[in-house]
């Protein structure tokens, strides 16, 4: 009886590196990259646990890095859309005479690079913070950074919504956070409380960094960018305090 119980216990030990049937993105060679990307994003939004359990190659980041690059481009495009709307609104202000298209184009490209590239870098930062937190969980199996990178990247599918003006980005952010909790609970087999707390703390740390960057960017936009890009009827001067 004791031997049978021991064998049963050994059989139920969780192996975090177990391979699944393959995600749509991993099968993009047969599905086509565009269709595979959108199908992966939709599964991430509506069946995140199933998607994460189907990862075929948890030991390499080749597929997940390409997926992350495309996700980062989406956030860069979102920043471009919102920057364009902001500059268009500025051009409609009563005291505005002209908006320099060349300067505006440069600023828009700069914003795309900062948000897209920044998102790519911040994801890696999230994985490092998250890995340190779950390493402290009692009874949690050893998780490699590569595994965490691969699993959590498939939580980013709601980024498709980021290109929707105004409402899209906050909805995407909340949805991604929910997916990250699912990643910890369903794929990494953490207790729900641990999965929630670890994902939330890591996510808040990243949002804090992003908030600081956004604040600096907004100050730049208000006090410097518009100074060069927008010509008004009122003599333009940099503010003095």
For the regions a protein language model found, what residue spans apply to each?
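Low-complexity, Gly/Pro
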Residues: 1-16, 51, 88, 209, ...
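N-terminal juxtamembrane cytosolic/stromal segments of multi-pass membrane proteins
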Residues: 2-74
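Hydrophobic alpha-helical transmembrane segments
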Residues: 7-23, 48, 54-55, 93-103, ...
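Selective transmembrane helix interface/packing segments
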Residues: 12, 16-19, 23-24, 28-31, ...
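Juxtamembrane loop-helix boundary motifs flanking transmembrane segments in multi-pass membrane proteins
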Residues: 29-44, 57, 61, 94-105, ...
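Juxtamembrane transmembrane-helix termini
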Residues: 53, 85-92, 135, 182-192, ...
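Membrane-helix interface segments in multi-pass membrane proteins
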Residues: 78-115, 162-173, 210-241
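Hydrophobic alpha-helical transmembrane segments and adjacent short intramembrane/lumenal linkers
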Residues: 107-111, 120-212
């Amino acid at each position: 009886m004791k031997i049978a119980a021991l064998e049963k216990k050994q059989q139920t030990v969780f192996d975090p590196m177990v391979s699944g049937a393959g995600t749509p993105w991993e099968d993009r060679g047969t599905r086509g990259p565009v269709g595979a990307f959108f199908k992966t994003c939709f599964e991430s939004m509506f069946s995140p646990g199933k998607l994460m359990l189907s990862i075929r190659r948890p030991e390499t980041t080749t597929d997940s890095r390409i997926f992350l690059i495309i996700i980062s481009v989406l956030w860069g495009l979102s920043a471009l859309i919102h920057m364009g709307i902001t500059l268009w609104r500025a051009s409609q202000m009563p005291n505005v005479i002209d908006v320099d298209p060349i300067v505006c184009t440069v600023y828009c490209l700069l914003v795309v690079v900062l948000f897209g590239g920044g998102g790519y870098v911040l994801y890696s930062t999230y994985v490092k913070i998250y890995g340190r937190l779950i390493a402290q969980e009692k009874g949690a199996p050893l998780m490699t950074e590569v595994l965490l990178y691969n699993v959590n990247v498939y939580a980013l599918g709601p980024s498709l919504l980021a290109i929707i003006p105004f409402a899209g980005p906050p909805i995407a952010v909340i949805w991604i956070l929910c997916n990250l909790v699912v990643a910890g609970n369903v794929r990494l087999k953490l207790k729900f409380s641990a999965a929630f707390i670890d994902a939330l703390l890591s996510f808040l740390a990243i949002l804090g960094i992003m908030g600081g960057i956004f604040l600096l960017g907004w100050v730049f936009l208000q006090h410097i960018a518009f100074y060069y890009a927008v010509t008004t009827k009122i003599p333009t001067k940099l503010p003095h305090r």
